[in-house]
Amino acid sequence: MHPEPSPVGTLLRYFSWPELRHHGLRHATAVLAVLLGVALAFSVHLINESALSEFSSAVRSVNGQADLSLRAAHGGFDEALYPGVARHPDVALASPVVEVSTLAIGPHGQKHSLKVIGLDPLVAAPLAPALIPHLAQGEDRLMLFATEAISLNAQARQKLGVEAGDTIEVQSGLALKKLRVVGTVIAGGEALGVMDIAGAQTVLGTLGQLSRIELKLVGGAQSAQVLQALQLPEGVVSDSGDESTQRVSNVSRAYRVNLTVLALVALFTGAFLVFSILSLSVAKRQQALALLGVLGLSARERLVLVLCESAAIGLLGSVLGIATGTGLAYTALKLLAGDLGGGYFPGIAPTLQWSPWAATAYGGLGVLAAVLGGWLPARAAKDLPPAQALKGLGDTHRASRMPWLGPVLLLLGVALALLPPVAGVPLWAYLSVACLLMGGIACVPGAVGLLLHLCPMPNSPAPLLAFERARRMRHTATVAIAGVVASLSLSVALTVMVASFRGSVTAWLDVVLPADLYARATSASSSGDALNLGQDLLDDVRHVPGVQRAVGIRVSSLSLSRSLGDVALLSRPLGQAERSLPLVGDLLPAQSGRVSIYVSEAMVDLHGAAPGQTLALPLRAGQPPVQAFVRGVWRDYARQQGAIVIDQADYQRLTGDQAVNDLALWLAPEARTPDVQSAIRRAAEARGLASGLIEFAEPRQIRETTLRIFDRSFAVTYWLQAVAIGIGLFGTAASFSAQVLARRKEFGLLSHLGFTHRQVLGIVGGEGLVLTGIGALLGLGLGLAVSVVLVEVVNPQSFHWTMDLLAPWDRLGLLCLGVVLAGTLTALVAGRQAIGRDAVMAVKEDW
């Protein structure tokens, strides 16, 4: 005999589909929640993969086929190193390179950052064919070696609006040097131009210096052995294109993982919405499901039927989410150029890299979230007693068989929060947050019973009934307020985290911006190598009327590890470090005869530079590293890979570098800022400099700009808070509606006992007030616990900085009050729909 086919497929068509059509808006909301979660997570993945792919391609086009790249750990190195490297028997080809990031101005005034690469076209051709200029028609071949000739890639030509034969200006300090566009290069990525190496050194002021040497080794030569034989001078390190890509991937990993987790939060709340929608659906179809059970549909088939409904919601939401995520990623790549708002891929314009495997994986996450959300309603349908349910007496919500689960999950969440990160990602902290959320929700029935037991018993009949039902049927509260607890706790946690971060950044800005006015050379990038205001201009500024004090600041990059990104080295007059730096912890006394430095928190985590330790600084190629003493740690929210502050006198003595990137100016009380700015521009013009390249900013402007960027970066969290609260309230509405509809006989009996409609409605509203009030209280407490993990664990492990925990009680109070009012109103609306003649007549159904 052949086994009978399962009736689930037929029931999906004739039983489930009409329900879906009849309540299309309700189910569409669940589909929308899954859609949003999948779309956000998939778009973050696409943006990052596309940006990384484009960055890798750009690195390969610049580095070409080189096996090794030699560069200075800080600044450049003497070109005298090149001949010895080129003559080594294991080196087949050695190409010297000068590379400077600067500002370019097109013929029509367009400004854009430009990477200028100087190389020897005859030597570099086999190594980096993408960087070899293709001269425009009519140009003499000798223009390849002309001092003031440059060839631009497509990105540079587009941004500057130039063609062959046009003239552009590039910035060198506060001077503008004219260059003629003579050809093109096919290299992709950010805007760049290629010059003959001698011309680049002359124009950009790097005579006698090289940025790097690209090496092609002979067949069979091993990189490690060649490096050992070369005996490179101190401060010169080796690198490869793959290592550069891996460094950027490592730096951006924490940022993109956090964005992905935020996106999965939407999926988490979407699962609760599916749970609430299907709970309502099962409650409304309780008698129909019972009839199907009497007619032969097994408990297992009822379980499968509801799970198939949840999977259908997840599948539709996932398919639409993948399409929406693709559109979001495409739009973001056009508007943000793959930057993700974190500044990790500056200057590149990636194309969308769509992956069917990634689409399948993220779509599967959406289906899985929906199925998990439908599991409890499916179990309720499976455990339905058909005989009782046909009479409307079935209870779809039973007491938990595992009362210990909630406390165990909470304890597990606390334990996981104490574990270190995994490969730089706070994996255990994320699992801790998940355990805290699930454990808190599992504790809802017990917490409701405990809180109601502690509350005084009301005397009036209606409040007494509302109070007693909430206490005695508290296991139904898990369904009624689980959405409120989940969504409110997430919203509270995000609110506290963002408020803590914003408050800490504001306090940090107050310390690091003590001057009245700041000046710098104009550029699209704050770290451009050619941005040098010059020591002479600084001396002139100190004599400008209205300037009481002028301090020059030098910012440069320093490589301390091949696997980690470069750290920022800040040289400035320090004086009393405890007053000029936002220190964290105690400041150790300086050691006589040793250079003192002050490191950011990231330096402690990434490089082990704790106070009292000695850190080797390769400040000058060809000289031994400086053994610097770490006096203290300071808070820095601007440089995720770490920063070091060194006194300017020590820096200039050790490096001979007199350059200045920024000026900090303290003005006299009677001085007018516009007059001081004009006087500084005149001083620059008197030295033959381009005064228009100087930009000024007051601390207020810098603070406003920084906080505006901060708010824009966290816009997605504000949006997720709104989504979470909306989904939670919708789930509460669905749960209350399900319970009220299942209690029509109870309301009818109360009416027969003499309760008026208003009193019965008051009972329903009272239950809603009690349950949502308790839900808000639990959500607030759980959210504060989660926020502690986010602030004290996730942020330090992800970005290597700490912040002060700040709870905005006014906003949190309004948030909880709004949830309680909305939940109570929802219960009243649901009660009005269930109370009436139908409720009175429902009592006769058993007679």
Question: Where do the protein language model's features map onto the residues?
Answer:
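Peri-transmembrane interface segments
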Residues: F55, L230-F268, A283, L292, ...
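Small-residue transmembrane helix packing/gating motifs
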Residues: V62, L144, T184-G219, V512, ...
